[in-house]
């Protein structure tokens, strides 16, 4: 591998620290950077859950010191607010369910950060994502399928992938932690973050309520058309949700009810039985295709419809600014705003073909 000048995005976690260390071991000229993203005061409390905390910044700096690389903090809060946080709120207000980690990769880590890195003379950005990027430029699943993050990287363009490095793709999380211990990194046993970084303590409903206010409306049963409850904000619900519906009466058939759809125009949440969640066709928009030339005809592949979701065989057609997937078996709980990522099965790791944002 040719040694290049790389910027290591260091979140303060074990993955990004080991990724930076591996880049140094590979002979690259590495500089570490921690992104200051969230300006929610609650994220700066000692012991606050999530990421973007003061502890994370300190952990990233300590890791850089142990590795022996220069370290800086870049303030990306304004860009992050506009492209990720405001987008998150607007999507929920529109009745969709966004994936902010995916949007952050698309707009911040591999756009704003990469653009600044290139302007400063860096050749690539290295991150601790669990995914593989081969010499052929194709993005593949990690060997550790339980930690695979290729889904949230599926939005990246060929140009962005061409300036990215993912050194952890051939390792399991257990191996990464063991290596961190061997390197003397204090984050070796630091727990993974599973929260949305800008939502303090994982309270998404409270976060949205502060910004969108109370907007009471009806909860309607799809089977009868009857109003079976009231809500204080349709933004608090997502397709497939069962808990927290607070219905006024049992369903006529006695079966559990799930959120089937959210209609912002009428401020209505529609609920129904589980089987009504099943869909066999998915429409999506703004496709990004990286696994070779964009197909002129429908192709057979596999698709993933949410992070850590099941993989489903499908026939996918890409036309203009749209993508259509005919699922070979019905899937429940497909939510607008999430990504559909297409994969080609491969013995060397399933290849990401492309992605798009689910519209319906």
UniProtKB/Swiss-Prot annotation:
Its EC number is 2.8.1.13. GO terms for molecular function: ATP binding; tRNA binding; tRNA-uridine 2-sulfurtransferase activity. The record marks 129, 338 as: Interaction with tRNA. Gene3D superfamilies: Adenine nucleotide alpha hydrolases-like domains, HUPs, Translation factors. It catalyses: S-sulfanyl-L-cysteinyl-[protein] + uridine(34) in tRNA + AH2 + ATP = 2-thiouridine(34) in tRNA + L-cysteinyl-[protein] + A + AMP + diphosphate + H(+). ATP binds at residues 9-16, 35, 128. GO terms for cellular component: cytoplasm. It is found in: Cytoplasm. One of its GO terms (biological process) is tRNA wobble position uridine thiolation. The keyword RNA-binding applies. Keywords: ATP-binding, Cytoplasm, Disulfide bond, Nucleotide-binding, RNA-binding, Transferase, tRNA processing, tRNA-binding. Residues 147-149 are annotated as: Interaction with tRNA. NCBIfam families: PRK00143.1, trmU. Belongs to the MnmA/TRMU family. This is tRNA-specific 2-thiouridylase MnmA. The gene is mnmA.
């Amino acid at each position: 591998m040719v040694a290049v000048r790389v910027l290591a995005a260091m979140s303060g976690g074990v993955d990004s620290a080991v990724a930076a260390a591996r880049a140094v071991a590979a002979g690259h000229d590495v500089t570490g950077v921690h992104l200051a993203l969230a300006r929610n005061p609650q994220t700066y409390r000692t012991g606050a859950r999530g990421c973007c905390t003061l502890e994370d910044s300190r952990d990233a700096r300590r890791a850089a010191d142990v590795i022996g690389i220069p370290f800086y903090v870049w303030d990306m809060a304004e860009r992050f607010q506009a492209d990720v946080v405001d987008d998150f709120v607007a999507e929920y207000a529109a009745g969709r369910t966004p994936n902010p980690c995916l949007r952050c990769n698309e707009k911040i880590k591999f756009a704003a950060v990469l653009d600044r890195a290139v302007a400063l003379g860096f050749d690539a950005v290295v991150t601790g994502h669990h995914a593989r990027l081969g010499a052929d430029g194709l993005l593949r699943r990690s060997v550790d399928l339980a930690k695979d993050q290729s889904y949230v990287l599926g939005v990246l363009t060929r140009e962005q992938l061409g300036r990215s490095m993912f050194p952890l793709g051939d390792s399991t999380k257990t191996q990464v932690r063991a290596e961190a211990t061997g390197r003397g990194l204090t984050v070796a046993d630091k727990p993974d973050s599973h929260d949305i970084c800008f939502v303090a303590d994982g309270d998404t409903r409270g976060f949205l309520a502060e910004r969108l206010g109370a907007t009471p409306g009806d909860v309607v049963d799809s089977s009868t058309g009857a109003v079976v409850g009231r809500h204080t904000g349709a933004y608090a619900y997502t397709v497939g949700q069962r808990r927290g519906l607070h219905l006024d009466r049992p369903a006529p058939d006695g079966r559990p009810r799930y959120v089937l759809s959210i209609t912002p125009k009428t401020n209505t949440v529609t609920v129904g039985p589980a089987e009504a969640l099943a869909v066999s066709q998915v429409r999506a928009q703004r496709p990004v295709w990286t696994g070779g030339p964009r197909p002129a005809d429908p192709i057979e592949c596999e698709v993933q419809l949410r992070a850590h979701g099941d993989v489903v065989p499908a026939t996918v057609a890409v036309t203009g600014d749209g993508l259509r997937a005919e699922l070979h078996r019905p899937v429940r709980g497909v939510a607008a705003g999430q990504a559909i990522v297409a994969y080609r099965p491969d013995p060397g790791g399933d290849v990401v073909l492309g992605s798009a944002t689910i519209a319906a």
